[in-house]
Every structure is written in C-alpha cells, then in structure tokens.
Amino acid sequence: MSNTLPHPSGSWRNRYLLMRHGHSLANQQGLIISHPDNGLTGYGLSPLGESQLEQLVAAWSWPTPTRVVHSDFLRTTETAARVARHFGLDTEVDVRLRERCFGALERQADSHYPAVWALDAQDPTHGEYGVESVASVAERLQAVIAELEETYLDATILLVSHGDPLQILLTALAGQPLSAHRDRPALTPASITPLG
C-alpha cells in the first residue's frame, strides 16, 4: 500500500520512504506495546505481518532504497531486516524512530488509543496518562530527517517506524497543526509513504 504526501516547500536532498512496520503480535493481540522494556525483545511480526512483507518486496513499486534506518523495536527491526535483505542492504538503528510512549496505557487494550488521540486534538503538548506528547514525537522524528538531509545527498532512505510517530511526522512536514495528526488517513501496517 502506498500513501502520498504533498511536497513541502523547499527541496529535499534525498528521497524518503516512510514505512510502518508489518502487522505485529501486538496488533494481533490488540495491545499497546510502546515501552522498550516490552517492545525491544517481544511482540515482533505476526504471521500476517510476515506475509505482508513477503508480498511487499515481491511487488516492490517504489524507488530502490540505498539505506534502511529503523526503530529498534522488534517489529520494526524485523520489518527493516526483511526489506534490507531483499535489496542486499545493511540496516541502521535510530532510537528516535521508536514508538510513541503511551505511559500508563502500556500493555492495555488498544481501544484506549482514541482517548489519547482526542486529547491530542485539544493539546499536542499534553502528557495525560504519562504519554509522550505529540510535540515531542514530532521534534524527534523531524530531527532524524534533518540529520539525514545534512549527511546524505541523492540517497533513497527507507525509514521504518510506527503508526503514531509517522502520522505525526507527516502532519508536521505538511505544515498542519500537530493536533490534527489523526485527521490524516491512518497508516496501515506495512504501508509506505514516499517523501521527496
């Protein structure tokens, strides 16, 4: 699945493929897994996620990546490894691509997400339930892009991250209010959004 983003003002030095990890065991179980204690070594790809990636690389229709950078959570690491292996690339970890931390909602049902998103729409700096604010997520993901822009030229960089962080990044890059990040169409597992 592919998504599109209006080209922001200015020109990019590189092309980016923003990828949400494949369907995970956390998705399968309907759980919020956002803390490194749980996400680094557990809740990797589900059988559906493995199948999604197999189909994705077999029918790849985006520019061929030259670098693969990913969150260090197991589900993103496995996703990145599968794509990188297909193209004969190594992977690179950047912890700034990690899942948004959902605080006290960790290991709770994912039916709690809408309550957080409703608060996000009122105040992108809120930290209710101990969640990481939308503003903080936007800052760290934009810093990844800024650093890559300074470091590389004419690269095609696959960034493998998580649903909320990528939604927030896309909202920020489009110049929209961060409070509107859930107004964007939801990024589905194993989807890719080209940028630049």
Q: PLM ranges: what are they?
A:
Residues 2-15, 19, 23-87:
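Active-site-proximal alpha-helix that buttresses catalytic centers in soluble enzyme cores
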Residues 70-71, 139, 160-161:
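Short beta-strand scaffold positions
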Residues 24, 165-166:
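Short active-site segment of divalent metal-dependent hydrolases/proteases
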